[in-house]
Amino acid sequence: MMLLSQPGIWLLVSLFLCSSVNSISLWKSHPLVAGSNEPDQKRPDTPSSPRPLGITGAALLNYFEQNLRTMEVPDTAGVPQDSAYYTALTHYLGLCGARSENCDPGQSAVAKLTRDVPVLTRVHSHNDYWRRVPLLQALAYGVASVEADVWLENNGTTLLVGHNRVFLEPAHDLGRLYIEPITRMLQEVNCKSENKGDPYGIFYNAPEEQLLLYIDFKSLDRKLTYKLLLDYLKPLIDNNFISYYDMDAKRFVSRPVTVVLTGNYPSDEEIGVPSPRRYTFLDAPLGRLSSVGDEFTANNVSVVASSSLLELMLRCGKASNPSLTEQTAWESYGCLVEYVREAHRRDLRARIWGLPDWPVSTRENLWDMLTDMGVDYLNVDDLDAVSKF
């Protein structure tokens, strides 16, 4: 259903130009916006908080893609400028510039982006930072797990996001692309919350759902990367938005964001066991769980175990070269499912990556197979396709 006519396009332009426009909310009430003792007041639009358009999720992304040429995109300092699309969307969501002092979860970035969007709790946004709008595109599709590859740069003072070091850009800082927008979105939806011990999450219709944030260590100096990462995570820690394991109470405390380290991360032996709280959890080796003993204990060390499909196929003796087929995958079903069951016996979630993207029928048949096995996260590049799967 198209909520805006041609004049609506110019309305959006005027919002970016800081015009004061009144709009009618067609959205129903929600726990995030209910309970205020203050009378409702009409607030003027601000450059950092344009009024909601009334469309969310993938429809909102499509709207921006189709109408970007008619919008005047502000030049906002501190925002990656290689994409007018990214800048326009973050401006509309109110994620640019200073945070508004108004407490109005109904006009928050979470409401504008994820209202009425079903949460895809079994999907992981593979190479999320390659998307046209990192993080936000995944959230718009309801994806509850994203990843960022990080590199040490600027003499070990900065973590930049990217797959290959040669293509790193100064604007693609881990804080700007992930930590800061996540923190701001959670601050907005929790501004009225009296229960600071159980904050709302990043999905409007499912505030109890967690977002898994994978940090893939790429640099050789993993100890320094880890130390710097804790500095980056400080806004989430200070606002009580990040899950942790309480070493003294010996319990896992769930929060809106859970951080999982993967790639070249350091072991506890290298950095020391985090105390009194562990704020980052290690991606356990799904293919080697039976041989690692208690090294990756659920909740106090790890929450997820991961492996490529090819690695598991090799362990099952069904793949002798870098290629794999749908037929050999199905032939390995009995062996593959045991790895998933071993993870579940240890109270770990299972993620399998490295599925072929083509042909589409093969990819979707393998999605079916992994889902049937009980795999908790499908590693996905095509979010639109998996949202219709």
Swiss-Prot record:
Keywords: Signal. It comes from the Eukaryota. SUPFAM superfamilies: PLC-like phosphodiesterases (SSF51695). Residues 1-23 form the signal peptide. GO terms for molecular function: phosphoric diester hydrolase activity. One of its GO terms (biological process) is lipid metabolic process. Belongs to the AIM6 family. This is Altered inheritance of mitochondria protein 6. The lineage of its organism: Eukaryota, Fungi, Dikarya, Ascomycota, Saccharomycotina. The gene is AIM6.
